């Protein structure tokens, strides 16, 4: 794959005390049943925070108060190249409703590494579990 520019994606690190919201990809999706943070592709010309708010409404039916950038990575999967910008979310309005995932859980921070996360997210997961991020 020789893509010069990565696909821009934004994802939320939703924090509730010592718990982090994690989402399991639907079994029929690419990388099915692996865990990730909610979010999605940024549209051309779209602000990162606006994109994440839109994705969280679509995926979880919440209106998020999107905060600061906490981590950024680039990762080359066999079939695509992505740049993921992770933004903190410490509050939201509405009741969480799983609209697209196999499962959604509030995971205790220390337990995060026990989930089978997407390869690209694993270093971030370790850093969150150690309390280095958010």
Give the residues covered by each predicted segment:
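A conserved beta-turn-beta hairpin within the catalytic core of GNAT-like acetyltransferases
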Residues: 29-34
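C-terminal structural segments of small proteins and small subunits
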Residues: 93-94, 109-122
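Charged phosphate-binding loop/patch that engages nucleotide di/tri-phosphates or the phosphate backbone
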Residues: 120-134
């Amino acid at each position: 794959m020789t893509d010069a520019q990565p696909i821009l994606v934004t994802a939320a690190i939703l924090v509730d005390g010592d718990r982090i919201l994690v989402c399991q990809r639907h079994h029929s999706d690419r990388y099915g049943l692996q865990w990730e943070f909610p979010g999605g592709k940024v549209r051309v010309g779209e602000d990162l925070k606006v994109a994440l708010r839109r994705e969280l409404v679509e995926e979880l039916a919440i209106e998020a108060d999107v905060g600061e950038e906490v981590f950024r990575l680039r990762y080359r999967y066999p079939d695509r190249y992505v740049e993921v910008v992770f933004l903190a979310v410490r509050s939201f309005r509405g009741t969480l409703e799983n609209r697209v995932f196999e499962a959604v859980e509030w995971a205790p921070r220390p337990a995060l590494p026990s989930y089978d996360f997407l390869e690209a997210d694993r270093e971030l997961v370790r850093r969150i579990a150690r309390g280095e991020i958010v």
